[in-house]
């Protein structure tokens, strides 16, 4: 139990004043030693959740009864009219923005004439709502597990900001709206959007407590948005040009160094809740897979050159950017400690946006250079100029 030791008093009390922005919070650990840790006001507000003893949970054990009781009370106390911010949190806005950016990047990279603002608008809104729906479904299915992990216990449902039935309704409505908008682009985009929601909610989420294969399934979820962007630009054709599949393969490969590093940082929480992750089930495999897929970026980047999407000069910045990620994946492979995992995680956050920015820049340079002659990728000279 976390306590504040009052000056001049041998008694301790729970500190409840929300006016202080930051303060020293003293508590006894299980070892009996006194330590000091900075806690933010958000942590103070939900510190009762952190005091619940969930250390005895295992992969096959039921949630602690104390956790069930506390969560039940929180859900019952949830407001009848939740704040809009609670719905926003259900959709994980930062993750949704990244998903939309990957879709738009693929749309911009596709070498097809007649790019349409209306198509891009429907694609953007449809992708965003599909992502919001999948994230909301995920949180609706796992409140019991979310309240046991430090990084997720302040989500809307565990902290009592929104009722579970409202979360389910929100996920359903955004899913219907998102897939409807995606179908307005073309049927291929619509089916990809719907399939991604089903894959995330129906397969990936329950598989997390069954097998480490969940990481590969989750990577498929991340690879679908670029296919949606490519299909939107190509009229639903994903096979006549390999660029869309290459972009999707990049997003698939990126998930492994990114997520494997992150799961290493929070592996104790995952183990406590029974999530079957390589980080604690097989740490050596976890590091090998991270390095393997980091190395995959080299041939995937060069594949862009062979398809004519970018010029040969693209190899220089692409190689440098990929080596930035590979170097940290190699360090993590050699020494699987927290520091190297953290370094790889933040490197992955920089790597993908930088690589896509370079790819789009080199693609546009090639388009401009080829604008006065017929381009075999774009088709006729007239289409090239229109593009």
Swiss-Prot record:
Principal location: mitochondrion
Keyword Transferase among record annotations: yes
Subcellular location: Mitochondrion membrane
Enzyme Commission code(s) on record: 2.5.1.141
Reactions it catalyzes: heme b + (2E,6E)-farnesyl diphosphate + H2O = Fe(II)-heme o + diphosphate
GO terms, biological process: heme A biosynthetic process
CDD domains reported in the protein's UniProt record: PT_UbiA_Cox10 (cd13957)
Membrane-spanning ranges: 95-115, 117-137, 183-203, 212-232, 242-262, 284-306, 311-330, 345-365
Keywords annotated in UniProt: Heme biosynthesis, Membrane, Mitochondrion, Transferase, Transit peptide, Transmembrane, Transmembrane helix
GO cellular component: mitochondrial inner membrane; mitochondrion
Gene3D superfamilies: UbiA prenyltransferase (1.10.357.140)
Bilayer topology: Multi-pass membrane protein
GO molecular function: protoheme IX farnesyltransferase activity
A Pfam family matched in the record: UbiA
Described purpose of this protein according to its UniProt entry: Converts protoheme IX and farnesyl diphosphate to heme O.
NCBIfam families registered for this protein in UniProt: cyoE_ctaB (TIGR01473)
Family the UniProt entry places it in: Belongs to the UbiA prenyltransferase family.
Protein name (Swiss-Prot/TrEMBL): Protoheme IX farnesyltransferase, mitochondrial
Lineage: Eukaryota, Fungi, Dikarya, Ascomycota, Taphrinomycotina
């Amino acid at each position: 139990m976390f306590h504040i030791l009052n000056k001049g008093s041998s008694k301790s009390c729970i500190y409840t004043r929300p006016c202080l922005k930051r303060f020293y919070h003293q508590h006894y650990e299980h070892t009996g030693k006194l330590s000091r840790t900075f806690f933010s006001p958000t942590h103070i507000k939900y510190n009762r959740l952190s005091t619940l003893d969930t250390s005895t949970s295992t992969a096959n054990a039921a949630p602690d009864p104390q956790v069930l009781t506390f969560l039940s009370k929180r859900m019952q106390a949830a407001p009848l009219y939740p704040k809009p911010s609670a719905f926003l949190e259900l959709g994980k806005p930062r993750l949704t923005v990244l998903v939309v950016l990957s879709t738009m990047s693929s749309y911009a990279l596709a070498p097809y004439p007649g790019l349409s603002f209306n198509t891009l608008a429907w694609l953007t809104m449809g992708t965003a709502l599909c992502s919001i729906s999948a994230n909301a479904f995920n949180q609706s299915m796992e409140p019991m597990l979310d309240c046991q992990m430090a990084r997720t216990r302040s989500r809307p449902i565990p902290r009592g900001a929104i009722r579970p039935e409202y979360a389910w309704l929100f996920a359903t409505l955004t899913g219907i709206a998102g897939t409807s908008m995606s179908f307005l682009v073309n049927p291929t985009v619509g089916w990809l959007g719907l399939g991604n929601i089903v894959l995330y909610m129906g397969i990936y989420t329950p598989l997390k407590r069954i097998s480490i294969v969940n990481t590969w399934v989750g990577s498929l979820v991340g690879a679908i948005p670029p296919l949606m962007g490519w299909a939107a630009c190509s009229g639903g054709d994903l096979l006549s040009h390999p660029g869309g599949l290459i972009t999707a393969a990049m997003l698939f490969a990126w998930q492994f160094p990114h997520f494997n590093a992150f799961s290493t940082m929070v592996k104790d929480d995952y183990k406590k809740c029974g999530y079957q992750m390589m980080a604690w089930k097989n740490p050596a495999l976890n590091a090998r897979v991270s390095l393997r897929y980091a190395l995959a970026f080299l041939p995937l980047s060069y594949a862009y050159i062979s398809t004519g999407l970018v010029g040969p000069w693209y190899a220089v910045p692409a190689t440098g950017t990929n080596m930035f990620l590979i170097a940290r994946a190699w360090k993590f492979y050699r020494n699987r400690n927290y520091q190297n995992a953290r370094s790889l995680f933040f490197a992955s956050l920089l790597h993908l946006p930088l690589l896509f920015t370079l790819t789009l820049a080199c693609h546009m340079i090639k388009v401009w250079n080829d604008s006065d002659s017929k381009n075999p990728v774009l088709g006729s000279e007239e289409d090239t100029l229109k593009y």
